[in-house]
Amino acid sequence: MIIPLIFILASTFGAPQDISALTVEGIQNPETLGAYVREYYKDTPILADIAWCESRMRHLGKDGDIVRGVVNSKDVGVMQINTRFHEATATEMGLDLKSLQGNLKYAEYLYEKEGTKPWNSSKPCWGSK
C-alpha cells in the first residue's frame, strides 16, 4: 500500500509532463512553473538557470498579464524573449512568444542558433553555474 501511495504522491507533486497540465494558477506560481521549466529543459539546464535569472520563473504576473522586462518592456515571458527582434520569426515558426509553450520553444531555437548570447545581459547571474 505504501509503494502505490508514493507513486501517486510523486506524480502529484512532480513537474508536469504536459504543458496543458499547467493551470493559470500553476503558471502564475514560480515554484510550480520552476519545476516545469527545469523538467522541460532537463537536457539544457543552462536555459532553466537563465529563466530563473531573467524572470525568477515567472511567465504571468499576479494580474494574469505576461511578465515584461523591467529594463525593456519588449522582453516577455519566462525566458524574456524580445518581441521587437524575435516576434516575426517566432510567428513564422507558428509560435506565440506570449504563450508559455511558445516562449520556451523559441528559447530552445535561439539557444540552438546562438547559444547563450541572447541572454548575455543576465550572464552575471547564470554564468557562474
Language-model segments: what does each one mean?
Residues 2-57:
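Export/targeting segments at the very N-terminus of extracytoplasmic proteins
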Residues 38, 42, 46, 52-56, ...:
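Sec-exported extracytoplasmic/periplasmic mature domains
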Residues 61-64:
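Short, solvent-exposed loop/turn and secondary-structure capping segments
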Residues 68-90:
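Substrate-binding/active-site groove segments that recognize
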